[in-house]
Amino acid sequence: MVAETGTGLFSAHKITEELASTSLDSGVHLLFDIHDRTFQALPDFLAEHRYQEVNDIRNTVFQKAFDTNLSIYEYLVHHPQLQAHMQDAMKLHQPEGDWLSVFPADEIVGNQQTAPDPARVLFVDIGGGMGQQCIRFRERYPDLAGRVILQDIPQTINRVPKPMPNGIEAVPHSFEDPQPIKSKSPRLDNLARERL
């Protein structure tokens, strides 16, 4: 967990830094404060709904677990600390790999561009939280012409530091509403998480 770099001198290993991060702390809060409670309600919820698919964001296991008619997003508006934990936890490093290393945007987009169009929509991250994937996309492909757009509910977009780096646009939008931005490559960030 720590390395001795000299007599009486120590430094943290990467794992120690990860364990001490705000993102991991927030992830632990989400596990205990939301997920555990939701998982405990899941068997009864599934039985009550005869194990059928549920497509109503206000009729999920979350409502049963928290005894509310609010969607998780509406609920979080009234519980800002939980909302902050959710946004911070979304910044956790994904150990299964980096999607940017397997998605060659420069090749795909570069082959489609005869003349770079800075007004063209390049990337939309739907439900992208604090914009970490948009930022990583722009850092990886700084020379690709086009707009990079972060979409999330207004309560989340209001927490995003402004202005965003590299011209990234933060736009309030619920994925339940029709998509106003047309793009060939939207990214719905971890859809399974959205359907809690």
UniProtKB/Swiss-Prot annotation:
Domain of life: Eukaryota
GO MF, any single term: methyltransferase activity
Function: O-methyltransferase; part of the gene cluster that mediates the biosynthesis of diterpenoid pyrones. The first step of the pathway is the synthesis of the alpha-pyrone moiety by the polyketide synthase dpmpA via condensation of one acetyl-CoA starter unit with 3 malonyl-CoA units and 2 methylations. The alpha-pyrone is then combined with geranylgeranyl pyrophosphate (GGPP) formed by the GGPP synthase dpmpD through the action of the prenyltransferase dpmpC to yield a linear alpha-pyrone diterpenoid.
Biological processes, Gene Ontology terms: methylation; terpenoid biosynthetic process
Biotechnological applications listed in the UniProt record: Diterpenoid pyrones display various biological activities and FDDP C shows anti-cancer and anti-HIV activities. FDDP C also shows inhibitory activity of 42-mer-amyloid beta aggregation that is involved in the pathogenesis of Alzheimer's disease.
Annotated metabolic or biological route of this protein: Secondary metabolite biosynthesis; terpenoid biosynthesis
Residues annotated as binding S-adenosyl-L-methionine: 127-128, 152, 174-175
Biased composition (Basic and acidic residues): 186-196
Name of the protein in its database record: O-methyltransferase dpmpI
InterPro entries from the UniProt entry: SAM-dependent_MTases_sf
Key words of the record: Methyltransferase, Transferase
The organism's taxonomic lineage, starting at the top: Eukaryota, Fungi, Dikarya, Ascomycota, Pezizomycotina
Chain segments carrying region Disordered: 166-196
EC numbers, comma separated: 2.1.1.-
Keyword Transmembrane carried by entry: no
Family: Belongs to the class I-like SAM-binding methyltransferase superfamily. Cation-independent O-methyltransferase family.
